[in-house]
Amino acid sequence: MLIDKDYIQKNLLREQEPSSLSSMALDGSAPACLAHANEALDEYNDNANAAFGKIERLLAVRDRSVTETRSRLQRDHYTERAIAESLERALHCGYLDDVRFAEGFIRMRLRASKGINGIVRDLKGHQIDAYAIPGFPDAFLEEQGSQLDNAIRLLERKPPRAKNKKQAAYAKLIRNGFSSSVASSAVKTWIAEREDQ
């Protein structure tokens, strides 16, 4: 939970008012607990420009979703106000775009032989509805090949090493996000090809 500086100051001052005279140091400085409160305030950065700079540095490495960027800024102790302002600015500039992120994410996962179910699940983690992306999944599957071909290619590239090849291959495909029907068809085809060799 991020803490607002004004909130902390108001609540700490309100709590300290009755005892503030008794807790004043001999030299007239602030009470020790207020000094600790100011240190806590320094942990949270309320500078929207600094948060925007952080977004620029993050996006220089790779494209990110709005949700991923927000959680990174929260982890780096920016206040909600700074996060909201910097995200709004990044969206306005076109630095952040969930549709663009999702399209690249889908293509990358399909090239890595991941299944549609796994891609949908991963995009939900970014708070993106995969089916709201234009052309999903058909347009992307046309570019990368069918799910069945991708599943077979995955098994050929990284065959299971267990004794029960059929069960291990099926489990591998399910873990990689393929539907059960695609996984079972791919395993049958893959086993048949191996027996022919």
Spans of model-derived segments:
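An alpha-helical, amphipathic repeat domain used for nucleic-acid recognition
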Residues: M1-Q197
